[in-house]
């Protein structure tokens, strides 16, 4: 009898060991640079495909529930990034074109019936019902920044899915319905020369947050200027977005002149979110050359991490990137002026167009050297802090999406070409007296 128990225990242990080996994530080594980029994009795409909300197809806010988010919580801005990732997956033939178009059509049909406020969607939405989930006590209505990231993706999808067949025709038409229904001018709060971030039927303008530059919100003003149905005046850009105490900079940090924004440039997502679709190459106006702005912002962030003035463990030429992310004590927007030792892979990887060599060095370090701790079923985890021996268990839609999209923009310029091909965007940029190679 005793021998039997020992035999049973041995068999059980063998089974557990075999299961552990089977469940261990395969991480191939010695890949070419191209194959590594393929793998990272494809693996990260799983967040927006395998983990998409099963009812609506919207992108879930995060992969864990550390902050009390339920499985029904989806993010509107992250969904826009997810739409762009579906385009990448289609172009690279990870999913079929018809499958992708039908997936996006399901999403768009859901959005047409979901809560919206003067055409704008809430920050968070229940992915099963379409009802608003309050982001905070008074933020229970429209969020035009999140909505802008959604439109960034939807307009790219409209341009990409251009076949003359029932599914793609319907997809384009319904995207246009949503786009044309957005009342940008409402969000000037009765005609002020600035756009306001929030409005709620319960709380009105109580959030009282005018959107002023320079930060991640430039796309809001470009879209509001591009609307054919409810546009805003150019003065809203020039007197609202531009006229702030933190718009112009002009100082030099680590040998790089920063035209706009906070000292040190702020978190790196400032140079990602608006520029997933908006191509900064040759984009300039009377205030800045936006390629110079974004590249120098990235180089300042890189050089700060390499110099590592606070002596955090792990910082190096192949381990850099400060942005908003999860961290050991919550969530924080990291930058050279707010550094807590936490590196987010999305920061360096979404900077591929600006710093390809430095970003590739970081990618190889994250994957080959730290991959046993950072690599996961949805690509890289959100962040890590080697000084604290802390590694996130989470992934966030707004961090995973830019990795896929900006690597693709580095490789092919796909999303840039799609977004900049929109007649409305070209019209809006002309209204702002901007220069771009895309303008005819």
Task: Describe each model-derived feature in a short phrase.
Residues 1-24:
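Bacterial Sec-dependent N-terminal signal peptides
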Residues 21-440:
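Ser/Thr/Asn(+Pro)-rich, low-complexity disordered segments
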């Amino acid at each position: 009898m005793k021998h039997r128990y020992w035999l049973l225990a041995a068999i059980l242990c063998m089974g557990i060991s075999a299961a552990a080996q089977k469940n261990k994530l395969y991480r191939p080594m010695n890949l070419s640079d191209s194959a590594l980029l393929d793998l990272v994009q494809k693996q990260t795409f799983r967040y927006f495909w395998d983990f998409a909300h099963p009812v609506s197809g919207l992108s879930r806010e995060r992969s864990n529930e550390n902050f009390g988010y339920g499985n029904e919580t989806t993010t509107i801005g992250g969904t826009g990034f997810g739409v762009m990732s579906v385009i990448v997956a289609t172009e690279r033939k990870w999913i079929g074109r018809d499958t992708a178009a039908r997936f996006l059509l399901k999403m768009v049909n859901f959005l047409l019936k979901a809560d919206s406020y003067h055409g704008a969607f809430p920050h968070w939405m229940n992915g099963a019902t379409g009802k608003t989930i309050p982001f905070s006590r008074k933020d229970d209505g429209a969020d035009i920044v999140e909505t802008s990231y959604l439109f960034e993706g939807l307009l790219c999808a409209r341009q990409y899915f251009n076949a003359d067949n029932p599914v793609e025709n319907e997809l384009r038409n319904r995207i246009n319905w949503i786009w044309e229904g957005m009342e940008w001018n409402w969000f000037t709060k009765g005609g002020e020369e600035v756009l306001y971030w929030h409005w709620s039927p319960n709380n009105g303008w109580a959030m009282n947050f005018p959107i002023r530059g320079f930060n991640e919100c430039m796309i809001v003003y470009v879209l509001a200027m591009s609307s054919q149905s409810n546009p805003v005046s150019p003065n809203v850009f020039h007197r609202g977005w531009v006229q702030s105490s933190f718009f112009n900079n002009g100082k030099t940090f680590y040998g790089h002149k920063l035209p706009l924004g906070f000292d040190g440039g702020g978190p790196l997502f400032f140079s990602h979110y608006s520029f997933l679709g908006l191509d900064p190459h040759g984009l300039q106006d009377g205030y800045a050359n936006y390629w110079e702005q974004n590249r120098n912002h990235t180089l300042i962030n890189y050089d700060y991490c390499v110099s590592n003035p606070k002596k955090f463990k792990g910082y190096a030429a192949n381990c850099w990137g400060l942005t908003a992310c999860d961290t050991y004590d919550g969530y924080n927007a990291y930058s050279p002026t707010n550094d807590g030792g936490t590196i987010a892979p999305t920061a360096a990887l979404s900077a591929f167009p600006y710093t390809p060599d430095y970003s590739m060095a970081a990618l190889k370090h994250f994957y080959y050297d730290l991959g046993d701790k950072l690599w996961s079923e949805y690509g890289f985890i959100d962040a890590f802090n080697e000084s604290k021996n802390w590694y996130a268990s989470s992934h966030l839609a707004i961090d995973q999406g830019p990795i896929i999209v900006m690597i693709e923009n580095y490789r092919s310029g796909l999303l840039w070409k799609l977004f900049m091909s929109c007649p409305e965007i070209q019209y809006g940029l002309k209204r702002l007296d901007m220069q771009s190679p895309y303008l005819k």
